């Protein structure tokens, strides 16, 4: 059974505790970064894919790029926040396939994750999660059926938090899959269209779009391949 304190901590995560990654500078030596484990924030290209790894620096997390669309992440210590994964430097209404293993212990998400600007929006299409269901701490405003499951649609607001445009106040859009999975295809256009029908309009300019693992005050491991 989850304790009351754990529930309060989990509820705060979606409401504003999870720290969104700011745009980290692209490394000057991407070939070196591709071949070593990362423990501090970085972005770049690896195996023909864009990658983004952000950490608040307070937890024990290691991110490693593999061949093509593969990456791995492990985290310990039950503290701190990170987000990392592979995908594309510019998002779009693409179909994204992924497969792999995802073994969280505590608060964590596996999702298609990205940003837009004008306006500034952070979005999640959550495919799997750890002990905390992110849809439990916000009001469901709709749903969409896509890729073999129903997704709950949520909207939250972040105030004076890190973003791809520095510290800012912005909306978060969420689709949370009701039948969790660790492999499959995500048709992002279906989610974007469903959000728009509910008045959740993405920005006119797409920033990066990745299949990400995120952890908050938890531990675990994952190995994901994106295509």
Curated annotation (Swiss-Prot):
> What are the start and end residues of every segment in region (Necrosis inducing domain)?
112-136
* Entry superkingdom: Eukaryota
Q: What is its EC number?
A: 3.2.1.8
Q: What happens when the gene is disrupted?
A: Causes only a moderate decrease, about 30%, in the level of extracellular endo-beta-1-4-xylanase activity and in the growth rate, but affects virulence, delaying the appearance of secondary lesions and reducing the average lesion size by more than 70%.
Named in its record, the pathway it takes part in is: Glycan degradation; xylan degradation
Pfam families recorded: Glyco_hydro_11
Coiled-coil region(s): none
The annotated active site, in chain numbering, is 122 (nucleophile), 214 (proton donor)
The cross-references to InterPro entries, in alphabetical order and at most eight, read:
ConA-like_dom_sf (IPR013320), GH11/12 (IPR013319), GH11_AS_1 (IPR018208), GH11_dom (IPR033123), Glyco_hydro_11 (IPR001137)
What's the entry's take on its domains?
The 25 amino acids necrosis inducing domain is localized at the protein surface where it mediates binding to the plant cell surface as well as induction of the necrosis on leaves, seedling growth inhibition, induction of a ROS burst, electrolyte leakage, cytoplasm shrinkage, autofluorescence, cell death, and induction of defense genes.
The name under which this protein is listed is Endo-1,4-beta-xylanase 11A
Originating organism = Botryotinia fuckeliana (strain B05.10) (Noble rot fungus)
């Amino acid at each position: 059974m989850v304790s009351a304190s754990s529930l309060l901590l989990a509820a705060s995560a979606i409401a504003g505790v999870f720290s969104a990654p700011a745009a980290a500078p692209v490394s000057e030596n991407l070939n070196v970064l591709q071949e070593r484990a990362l423990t501090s924030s970085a972005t770049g290209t690896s195996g023909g894919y864009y990658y983004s790894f952000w950490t608040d620096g307070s937890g024990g997390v290691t991110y490693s790029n593999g061949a093509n669309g593969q990456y791995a992440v492990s985290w310990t210590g039950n503290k701190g926040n990170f987000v990392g994964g592979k995908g594309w430097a510019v998002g779009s209404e693409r179909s994204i396939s992924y497969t792999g293993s995802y073994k969280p212990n505590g608060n964590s998400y596996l999702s298609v994750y990205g940003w837009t600007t004008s306006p500034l929006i952070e979005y999640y299409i959550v495919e799997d999660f750890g002990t905390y269901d992110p849809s439990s701490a916000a009001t469901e405003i709709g749903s969409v059926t896509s890729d073999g499951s129903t997704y709950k649609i949520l909207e939250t607001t972040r105030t004076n938090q890190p973003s791809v445009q520095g510290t800012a106040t912005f909306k978060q859009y969420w689709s949370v899959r009701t039948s969790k999975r660790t492999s499959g295809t995500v048709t992002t256009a279906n989610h974007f269209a469903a959000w728009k029908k509910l008045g959740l309009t993405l920005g006119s300019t797409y920033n990066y779009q990745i299949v990400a693992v995120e952890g908050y005050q938890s531990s675990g491991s994952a190995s994901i391949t994106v295509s």
